[in-house]
């Protein structure tokens, strides 16, 4: 999706890329995140304009990640179908970035169900995949019990979690010194997420700079 000019990749192009990654892992699980663009991960201008994505005053708080996908349901289902098709070639997990509302989670799961039905109708093979939620918005960390009822696993996205918890743009050099992974508020949120996941018997992983 990034570092390319013109149209975004179609379903078959995505499928080939995902399948290659799955096959290269020789049976080990592959976690594929749905489109996570916006803020520090922008698309090129032509692709953005194609999707009617206007320049935002504060992209970190705007139409990005799962919000962007849900605003473009046809594009989103296209990616979901490609990921599901790749699951026929090995162990695949699907990860949803930047969830903040249970309503977004429900919309996402509905989109996955629709994509599955489209593949069934087309006679294309796939297997059921585990679906996980990225916890990178404080709101998500604080409603973990509700999200854990809907998802199979969670992944702590520490870079954005720190940014949103401390109200700091990590790309802004004037406040970069305040970006603190060891801030008590950040650690309390992380502790809560891990505890709730353990209580629910769900796996939790960590990504971002804190993961090392």
Write out the residue ranges for each language-model feature.
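Conserved alpha/beta-domain cores
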Residues: 1-212
């Amino acid at each position: 999706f990034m570092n390319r000019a013109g149209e975004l990749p179609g379903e078959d192009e995505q499928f080939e890329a995902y399948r290659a990654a799955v096959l290269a892992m020789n049976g080990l699980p592959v976690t594929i995140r749905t489109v996570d663009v916006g803020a520090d991960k922008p698309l090129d201008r032509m692709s953005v304009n194609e999707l009617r994505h206007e320049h935002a005053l504060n992209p970190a708080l705007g139409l990005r990640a799962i919000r962007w996908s849900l605003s473009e349901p046809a594009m989103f289902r296209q990616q979901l179908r490609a990921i599901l098709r790749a699951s026929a070639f090995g162990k695949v997990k699907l990860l949803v970035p930047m969830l903040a509302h249970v309503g977004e989670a429900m919309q996402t799961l509905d989109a996955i169900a629709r994509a599955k039905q489209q593949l069934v109708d087309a006679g294309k093979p796939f297997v059921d995949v585990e679906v996980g939620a990225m916890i990178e918005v404080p709101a998500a960390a604080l409603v973990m019990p509700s999200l854990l009822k809907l998802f199979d696993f969670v992944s702590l996205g520490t870079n954005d979690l720190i940014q949103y918890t401390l109200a700091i743009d990590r790309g802004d050099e004037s406040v970069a010194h305040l970006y603190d992974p060891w801030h008590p508020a950040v650690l309390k949120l992380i502790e809560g997420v891990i505890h709730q996941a353990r209580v629910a018997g769900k796996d939790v992983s960590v990504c971002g700079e804190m993961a090392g």
